[in-house]
Amino acid sequence: MSDEKIINQPQDVVSEMLDGLTYAYGDLIEKVPDFEIIQRKSPKSGKVALVSGGGSGHKPAHAGFVGEGMLSAAVCGAIFTSPTPDQIYEAIKSADEGAGVLLIIKNYLGDVMNFEMAREMAEMEEIKVEQIIVDDDIAVENSLYTQGRRGVAGTVLVHKILGAAAHQEASLDEIKDLADKVVKNIKTIGLALSAATVPEVGKPGFVLDDNEIEYGVGIHSEPGYRREKMKTSYELATELVGKLKEEFKFEAGQKYGILVNGMGATPLMEQFIFMNDVAKLLTEENIEILFKKVGNYMTSIDMAGLSLTMIKLEDDQWLKNLNEDVKTISWG
């Protein structure tokens, strides 16, 4: 895969990307002056605010999910680099509508540390803040930037379910309680055919041999759990569904939602073929799939690959929240 990119200067990638995003979708979002923060343009409504974010390079996450029914604001760090506590604190202040703020944090050491520092800063200003840490990646227990499991594409489903609850005027305590329950029921596993290339580095994060894949690669090119020769889509789906089955311990009649997420360079054609194979495998398990989504929701710049997320729908309201209409750029 070519390392050439349509950019100007590598150090300007994030700021210019956000400027382009707000120019294109200025009816929905705006940039907080002097900060790499995207927030809703709609008037404040007095509801609980949801703030998420992290290093850039995962678009449309998280800025693409800012809007009515999802996030109030997204904090955008440098490529694959956690935003600073000051950035996050600014996002909390800007998003707060008086009912409190819930932080949705992917489980990476830098993100957790900086979001928690920002939370302390906000609480000193008497802003009510709660947080939830998303750790849906079942591939590995510890990684380069993580203690415990990583937070990956399942985070987007957390945005959606909690965003609907906030829109329905749930309290901060109610949304925090919901978050704790939802996160325990979301699990993700992925694979890569090629690594991401960070613009300022100029070379892939890892190298695979021709016709080789790696299972369990992280969204920052962290190592997975096995490499092997390329397989058919059905064989790849068998591997990922099998791992999720071990985690969830499928039982007939259980209700689930699924998300097939592209990592940045895998065409939708291939994602839909993979989804078809996942559907065949899950049909054999006699479980009900009540929510399905395919597309690029949390990418890794130009990585070729995909991930499969499943959410066990333990409450019918979760499904209703997933299906609620939103006004965002990228939920679709």
Curated annotation (Swiss-Prot):
One GO BP annotation of this record: glycerol catabolic process
Functional pathway: Polyol metabolism; glycerol degradation
Quaternary structure annotation from Swiss-Prot or TrEMBL: Homodimer. The dihydroxyacetone kinase complex is composed of a homodimer of DhaM, a homodimer of DhaK and the subunit DhaL.
Enzyme class: transferase
Catalytic activity line of the entry: dihydroxyacetone + phosphoenolpyruvate = dihydroxyacetone phosphate + pyruvate
Protein keywords: Glycerol metabolism, Kinase, Transferase
Record protein name field: PTS-dependent dihydroxyacetone kinase, dihydroxyacetone-binding subunit DhaK
Protein species of origin: Lactococcus lactis subsp. lactis (strain IL1403) (Streptococcus lactis)
SUPFAM superfamilies per the UniProt record, alphabetical: DAK1/DegV-like
Record bears the keyword Cell division: no
PROSITE patterns, per database record: DHAK (PS51481)
Annotated DhaK domain residues: 9-331
Signal sequence bounds: none
Cellular component, GO annotation: cytosol
GO-annotated molecular function: glycerone kinase activity; phosphoenolpyruvate-glycerone phosphotransferase activity
Induction of the gene: Induced by dihydroxyacetone via the DhaQ-DhaS complex.
Catalytic machinery residues: H58, H220
